[in-house]
Amino acid sequence: MSRKREMPDGGAKSVLSDLRFGRFVGRIRRSRHPALLLLALFVAACWLTWVNFSVALPRSQWQQAIWSPDIDIIEQMIFHYSQLPRLAISLLVGAGLGLVGVLFQQVLRNPLAEPTTLGVATGAQLGITVTTLWAIPGALTTQFAALTGACIVGALVFGVAWGKRLSPVTLILAGLVVSLYCGAINQLLVIFHHDQLQSMFLWSTGTLTQTDWSGVQRLWPQLLGGVMLTLLLLRPMTLMGLDDGVARNLGLALSLARLAALSLAIVLSALLVNAVGIIGFIGLFAPLLAKMLGARRLLARLMLAPLIGALILWLSDQIILWLTRVWMEVSTGSVTALIGAPLLLWLLPRLKSMSAPDMNASDRVAAERRHVLAFAVAGGALLLLATWVALSFGRDAHGWTWASGTLLEELMPWRWPRILAALMAGVMLAVAGCIIQRLTGNPMASPEVLGISSGAAFGVVLMLFLVPGNAFGWLLPAGSLGAAATLLIIMIAAGRGGFSPQRMLLAGMALSTAFTMLLMMLQASGDPRMAEVLTWLSGSTYNATGGQVTRTAIVMVILLAIVPLCRRWLTILPLGGDAARAVGMALTPSRIALLALAACLTATATMTIGPLSFVGLMAPHIARMLGFRRTMPHMVISALAGGVLLVFADWCGRMALFPYQIPAGLLSSFIGAPYFIYLLRKQSR
């Protein structure tokens, strides 16, 4: 017996109509602020382009310069072969970065995925650096090198996370670690081949300078092919946005489709890096803003995100041209980061519903260890042994020697300051990493990842530039202020979202990118003071003195003595704000106190060993993976692991290329990153 479908009466129709209209109005209101922002950016880009073109060439000559420039008029030649290609390349690269960002985020279901956070861009840059160092000619050679570097890094990162079904926490951790590793190799090559790679400073920050149309002619067919392949993968990628089981039930060969889409995104990323260098942030920001504008469907995001990326890079480059005329030449990637970081921080509180998989999903660690004291004693003995070996065992002109007696006394004034400096820096960074991870409840948080080390380093470098003469007395306050300001901005930006890991990482990466770009701008400026700073930024203990070590030790002892007093806070805060309030904890004062403590630890360590140490991320994870999750055991084992790691890194740095030295901060990345990747891979099985 057939049943007639009941139709809603007039009142019900009216209610449904009102509900639909209310949802429509709500969508308009949610997208109003980003739309107004885009409109303002578009107007600013058009106005700056008009101003820059008018200064470069009288408007009466624009038509001739565009179609058939007079070779006898230099201004027309510059307009045709430099400014117009630069405008075109900015639009192409911006659109390409927006497209790549959507591809990565859709396939991985991860709002933090983009070429820089996954390490793909850094791998491509490293490949190009190697070809530049070996002076291998040819445009195809650099393209092949960029593709090779990006593919190797991509295979490593995705291979680590594949066993955990591309878990967001594992994927981003692996990407950040491999990116730091490639960056350390790059920095090492620059230190030993500074003159040959001087031009890489400006290029590596992203520069759109063009001398002809060859770059545009080479890039646009490649991007067009990428767009066509993306459209062919539209249905599989739409299904990839669903649960894996649902996608398989709908007939999708999930692994094959995911591999194809990721390969396309990696290839496009490498081609973009080869064209203009690393321009971060756009691949992260453009898809995010497209989603905030209401583009929920994949096809809508694929159309809107490239337009947003092109607009942002267009505006950034026009600002560069204006700054070059009124101040000095800076890289486009630097301005992109400086524009994008405040915009992202402004938009973060407006992300009402930021959907992402659980950051702690399928996160397995070892069972909680007992007999903590025995492990702590063993770790302390290992640290003392590493220190004694670093003091006594080494190389000279005749080979390997074990120093003792008179020889050891002669070597001691040269060795003990740098070894103790490395040890203390490792301990402080490890403890700071533990505090930050517990304060934020985020396993990916650390001084390096959240940009706190970069903020401290920027504060120190800025003080060196602003204060004449001997400014040592101001370095610790400047570094502490930079670190505290960075962490405070991150917590304010992410606080309205309940300190979710996604918001914390977005804010941290925005600030980290901005500080890193500012430091690279100072390096590329040619200022003679930056030659001294470069070694410190790479994490060298070469200039450590007895007086500096003594002062650092006093500060470290005072700061570490405060940590046990905060044990209750550090135990409760990872449970969330509601749990903390339920047990009567004053949430804001405790967070501010822990914020200040972590900032001072980070600043003191950064002054000693620079911002590239990596220990603050790795040491807490090593302790946690070994089974130490309670507050004080976690702190103690992390501190011991950080101290051992940096002492060993400093010794290897002195011995590996004797008589030349590799900075301990860089070498700690070489030592720590492979082991950390191994632990991540082991967890995924």
From Swiss-Prot:
Q: What is its main location?
A: membrane
Q: Which CDD domains match?
A: TM_ABC_iron-siderophores_like (cd06550)
GO BP of this protein = siderophore-dependent iron import into cell
Tell where it localizes.
Cell inner membrane
- Which Gene Ontology molecular function entries are recorded, alphabetically? transmembrane transporter activity
Per UniProt, the keywords (alphabetical) are: Cell inner membrane, Cell membrane, Ion transport, Iron, Iron transport, Membrane, Transmembrane, Transmembrane helix, Transport
Looking at the UniProt entry, the stretches that span the membrane are 35-55, 87-107, 120-140, 143-163, 172-192, 222-242, 265-285, 302-322, 328-348, 373-393, 416-436, 456-476, 479-499, 504-524, 553-573, 592-612, 632-652, 660-680
Q: How does it sit in the membrane?
A: Multi-pass membrane protein
Q: What's any one GO cellular component for it?
A: plasma membrane
Assembly and binders:
The complex is composed of two ATP-binding proteins (FhuC), a transmembrane protein (FhuB) and a solute-binding protein (FhuD).
What is the role of the protein in this entry?
Part of the ABC transporter complex FhuCDB involved in iron(3+)-hydroxamate import. Responsible for the translocation of the substrate across the membrane. Involved in ferrioxamine-mediated iron(III) utilization.
Give the NCBIfam families listed for this entry: PRK10577.1-1, PRK10577.1-2, PRK10577.1-5
Similarity-based family: Belongs to the binding-protein-dependent transport system permease family. FecCD subfamily.
Q: What is the protein's name according to its record?
A: Iron(3+)-hydroxamate import system permease protein FhuB
Originating species: Salmonella typhimurium (strain LT2 / SGSC1412 / ATCC 700720)
